[in-house]
A protein has these predicted regions:
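Non-catalytic, conserved peripheral segments adjacent to functional cores
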Residues: 1-99, 120, 124, 128-138
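Conserved metal-binding segment of the jelly-roll/cupin
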Residues: 96-118
């Protein structure tokens, strides 16, 4: 079970999973395709670690991303850089933390940036394989 939260950015949302805790530890579903209501199908997963205070982005790619913080915390931002979008130029930010295992879905052609609020580790799932020729940095 998850709570799916809409944002002001067209097709951007964030997920807050239900965590099951007991004396052994924690279990939660950080991604399930039926949670997304999109055609998102991950084909690549990436690991990214950053030191506290690191600012990364804004990176724009032609593929969608699903970002989860598995250690520490970040302020994560989606920027709508799609010229034909009704929400073009708007942005949405959310704190992603390893204590909540919440995730942000970033639509294709939107920008992505984050500030590491503490040392952190992010896992990105993408619906296409990375191609450096298609990556744009602002």
């Amino acid at each position: 079970m998850v709570n799916r939260h809409s944002t002001d950015i067209d097709n951007c949302f964030w997920i807050e999973p239900t965590m099951f805790k007991d004396h052994r530890g924690i279990f939660c579903e950080i991604f399930k395709n039926s949670h997304s209501d999109t055609s998102f199908k991950p084909v690549q997963s990436n690991y990214s670690s950053s030191k506290k205070g690191t600012l990364r982005g804004i990176h724009r790619t032609p593929y969608a991303k699903y970002v989860t913080c598995i250690a520490g915390s970040v302020y994560d931002v989606c920027v709508d850089l799609r010229p034909s979008s009704k929400t073009h130029g708007q942005y949405f930010g959310v704190e992603l933390t390893s204590s909540k295992f919440n995730s942000l879905y970033i639509p294709a052609f939107c920008g992505h940036a984050f500030l590491a609020l503490e040392d952190c580790v992010l896992i990105y799932q993408q619906d296409h394989e990375y191609n450096s020729k298609l990556d744009q940095t602002y």
